[in-house]
Swiss-Prot record:
The keyword GTP-binding applies. GO terms for cellular component: cytosol. The gene is tuf. This is Elongation factor Tu. GTP binds at residues 19-26, 81-85, 136-139. Residues 81-84 are annotated as: G3. It comes from Prochlorococcus marinus (strain MIT 9215). Disulfide bonds: none annotated. Keywords: Cytoplasm, Elongation factor, GTP-binding, Hydrolase, Magnesium, Metal-binding, Nucleotide-binding, Protein biosynthesis. Residues 10-204 form the tr-type G domain. Pfam families: GTP_EFTU, GTP_EFTU_D2, GTP_EFTU_D3. It catalyses: GTP + H2O = GDP + phosphate + H(+). Residues 174-176 are annotated as: G5.
Amino acid sequence: MAREKFERNKPHVNIGTIGHVDHGKTTLTAAITNVLAKKGQAQAQDYGDIDGAPEERERGITINTAHVEYETEGRHYAHVDCPGHADYVKNMITGAAQMDGAILVCAATDGPMAQTKEHILLAKQVGVPALVVALNKCDMVDDEEIIELVEMEIRELLDSYDFPGDDIPIVQVSGLKALEGDSTWESKIEELMKAVDASIPEPEREVDKPFLMAVEDVFSITGRGTVATGRIERGKVKVGEEVEIVGIRDTRLTTVTGVEMFRKLLDEGMAGDNVGLLLRGVQKEDIERGMVLVKKGSITPHTQFEGEVYVLKKEEGGRHTPFFAGYRPQFYIRTTDVTGQITAFTSDDGSNVEMVMPGDRIKMTGELICPVAIEQGMRFAIREGGRTIGAGVVSKIIK
């Protein structure tokens, strides 16, 4: 019997559960898999399967994350759930689990709490485009008015972080009751998934975006010219197309005269391919690791930006001592280290701090010594002597 082929007949969307500790994120995740499993759209998982999330390493940082997958009528979902609050912070900042949307879990018994706010803020800053609210533990609240008050409070909170509070669906659920097989609450899980299908937009495919490839290596082929190799991050590139070389030095235009993959010639390379691009009129000295090849006119290099950063603890291999404004580390951006300076910072809630301790989360302003292709929403690492001491995401380009 031939093996079954993975059918990519449904659009794929990445989501996750976020929210305050003990509001029921993991129980809800388990409930979703159990309810959908009854329709043959998931493998049922219990709380323990998800809660015992294995450790993963992303950019030198250890993160616990559980991954589950399931389907609805119209989509295939990959869903991430993190056991600890610190794991969420690291996960969202490193982009270890890219989210196209999230289910914000808030217990009706408590209403929004500190981490509810922090996760909404994080979602905004790292560019999670859409949220759906699961108002959990509704089986424990008899008074409909209390539920209405909590809903109003959540909507105001979402508004205050620039999410469309009035339009975001809030679905009353009970993860626990649904897990226990109570049909009333099982149908609420189905209602939640319909809201997710409808309100979380399908992400634009990487292949449809303008071409970009970060240069990993460069070599010359006698008689043919210079080849730049790397993985195409987005878009596609055809033989004969003009591309720009951006970053580190002045931007220059060249033409792609050949695309190779695994020593075979291609007409075009596309997102996800590891390719070598033969470039017309470019000397080996003109191009280096850390530059990017891009669709003409699609991107400009920058030196100043704002970022959200998680600074590693000593136990995670980070610094043992604090640092101050004016600190000069390396910023590892795409494929290379660029020296820069952290010119200013505040703590993540905007309050002023004199120094940054290992384990802190900060908003920072950075300035690089040479212009590089940085973009809003892009991830970077902060390194010192080749070891990672922080991870960040670009929240704003200054210049």
